[in-house]
């Protein structure tokens, strides 16, 4: 084909490509900025438990990409975020987790707070629940720190911190969500104890998943309108 004949075809290809790119950009912008609300009360506790178990494994195995993908799936399927928003929000969650993981003391851990604030600010703006973003972000970080420094805390401190986080998000009395906190803390304790003893087996992960399933089921019942 001569250059004269190719020129119109190349122009057509360029125009089609530009149109496709424009449509993709419009779709992304619509996804990001079109106002919509989602319910944080409507989730499948079994699926949340399955994904949280997977995320814990990815975190401790230092699998950043896998953790990001699991967080995206959780936000998209259980908290009803759109594909683009779920990726943006998951980035902040995963980044906060690994910033915290590298920390050695409270001043290091607090470097994760800006990403946690961005994470919860997105959820606040998308959810049908009005909560204090800064307070919730601080409570999230606080249970991370209590868990990391658990040898310096009483046995019930972690369960209480986990319950206080959900109480602040859902605007319910902390006593109503203590069972959630207790079961989730128990799952964490099993993971920590088994890791210190040489390794977490598949049977251990199954037990952890069961505790998390019961924990999230308890929360789902506690926060229903």
Residue spans of the language-model regions?
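Generic helix N-cap/helix-start motif at coil->alpha-helix transitions
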Residues: 44-52
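Helix-turn-helix repeat elements of alpha-solenoid scaffolds
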Residues: 60-72, 108-113
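TPR repeat positional signature
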Residues: 51-54, 89-93, 186
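Hydrophobic membrane-insertion alpha-helices, especially the h-region
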Residues: 14-33
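Extended amphipathic alpha-helical interaction segments
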Residues: 113-195
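A cross-kingdom marker for long, charged
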Residues: 200-225
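Hydrophobic/aromatic side-chain positions at a characteristic register within alpha-helices
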Residues: 59-60, 97-104
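Short, charge-rich amphipathic alpha-helical segments embedded
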Residues: 69-100
């Amino acid at each position: 084909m001569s250059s004269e004949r190719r020129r119109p075809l190349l122009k057509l290809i360029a125009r089609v490509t530009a149109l496709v790119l424009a449509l993709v950009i419009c779709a992304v912008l619509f996804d990001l900025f079109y106002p919509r609300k989602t319910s944080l009360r409507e989730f499948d506790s079994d699926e949340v438990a399955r994904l949280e178990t997977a995320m814990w494994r990815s975190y401790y195995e230092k699998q950043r990409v896998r953790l990001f993908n699991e967080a995206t799936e959780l936000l998209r399927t259980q908290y009803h975020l759109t594909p683009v928003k779920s990726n943006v929000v998951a980035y902040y969650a995963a980044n906060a987790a690994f910033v915290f993981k590298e920390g050695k003391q409270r001043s290091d851990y607090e470097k994760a707070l800006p990403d946690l604030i961005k994470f919860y600010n997105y959820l606040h703006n998308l959810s049908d629940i009005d909560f204090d973003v800064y307070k919730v972000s601080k409570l999230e970080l606080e249970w991370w720190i209590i868990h990391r420094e658990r040898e310096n805390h009483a046995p019930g401190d972690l369960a209480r911190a986990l319950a206080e986080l959900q109480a602040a998000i859902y605007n319910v009395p902390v006593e109503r969500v203590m069972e959630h906190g207790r079961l989730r803390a128990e799952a964490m304790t099993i993971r920590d104890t088994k890791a210190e003893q040489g390794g977490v087996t598949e049977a251990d992960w199954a037990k952890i998943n069961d505790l998390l399933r019961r924990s999230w089921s308890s929360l789902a019942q506690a926060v229903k309108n």
